[in-house]
């Protein structure tokens, strides 16, 4: 797809500095710039790298700059770059239809222009919304509802009664609605707690590959609107996540935890059961939250157990000083021993 800089600037609401008739057909990353491409560069070093390359033009943020290359200046260059990715590399259009190997249960409702791929199983009573895409080898349980324009990638399993919203993307091998990990030790054995609930995934959620979201013991496990979940995340039974949360890889959230809106979980965070997390909390990588804790709005937490950032940094600095403190104590102990020995000698001389 060839586009002139003039057309690109109109698309991203930017301004061309230089020859706006130049055309480009592709985008390049800053570490592999192709001849004749458009490259997004931020920072002085990257801009110089782009200027010395064979790129046709550079996408940059606003500001005064002299460059030998044509420029497209925009208010938000990364947002513009996303728009250009969609422009130059639009997603492959999938023709609607039901593959002959798919198994469709009784009273299943398929919306307009739905695609059901090879070896998909949809159990009885389920509803698939308009323009949704179910790729190969997916299992949809009984009475599942999936909204419009939702894409389910291969090998996903969605258990009975779950509710998936519109504009949702679920990546490969994720499991929605499996039993929670609930047991109680009775009479010398682990007695399983039945899980009769389901999972609700609200609109505009994206879930990465190999993630598991367990159904509630009773009622619903809820993933709030606009939340984005990375690969390899575990969300336990009866968890309720607010809107627009970010959950990075290897994070585990234990049962009955609730979060507000715009909460960020960095990688490998562990949250115990019955924790309440208010809006706009940030949990740093490898943070561990003990059971029944209440994390306050807008606070950054670090460490294990989780502490507010300032407290955690002071604690870490103190821990790092322990070897020096021990060395000083040892030195002082030796000095005291020498002084005591001298005092003992003087005391004997007086006698």
From Swiss-Prot:
Give the Pfam families listed for this entry.
Answer: Hexapep, LpxD
Q: Which UniProt keywords apply?
A: Acyltransferase, Lipid A biosynthesis, Lipid biosynthesis, Lipid metabolism, Repeat, Transferase
Question: Which EC number(s) are documented for this chain?
Answer: 2.3.1.191
The residues responsible for catalysis, as annotated, are 237 (proton acceptor)
Q: What does the record list as GO biological process?
A: lipid A biosynthetic process
Q: Which Gene3D superfamilies match?
A: Hexapeptide repeat proteins, MurE/MurF, N-terminal domain
Supply the InterPro entries for this chain.
Hexapep, Hexapep_transf_CS, LpxD, Trimer_LpxA-like_sf, UDP_GlcNAc_AcTrfase_non-rep
Catalysed reaction(s) here are: a UDP-3-O-[(3R)-3-hydroxyacyl]-alpha-D-glucosamine + a (3R)-hydroxyacyl-[ACP] = a UDP-2-N,3-O-bis[(3R)-3-hydroxyacyl]-alpha-D-glucosamine + holo-[ACP] + H(+)
* Coiled-coil regions, chain positions: none
Q: Which CDD domains match?
A: LbH_LpxD
The terms describing its cellular component in GO are: membrane
> So what does this one do?
Catalyzes the N-acylation of UDP-3-O-acylglucosamine using 3-hydroxyacyl-ACP as the acyl donor. Is involved in the biosynthesis of lipid A, a phosphorylated glycolipid that anchors the lipopolysaccharide to the outer membrane of the cell.
By its UniProt entry, which NCBIfam families does this protein fall under?
lipid_A_lpxD (TIGR01853), PRK00892.1 (NF002060)
Family affiliation:
Belongs to the transferase hexapeptide repeat family. LpxD subfamily.
Assembly and oligomerization: Homotrimer.
> Per its record, how is this protein called by name?
UDP-3-O-acylglucosamine N-acyltransferase 1
Source organism of the structure: Legionella pneumophila subsp. pneumophila (strain Philadelphia 1 / ATCC 33152 / DSM 7513)
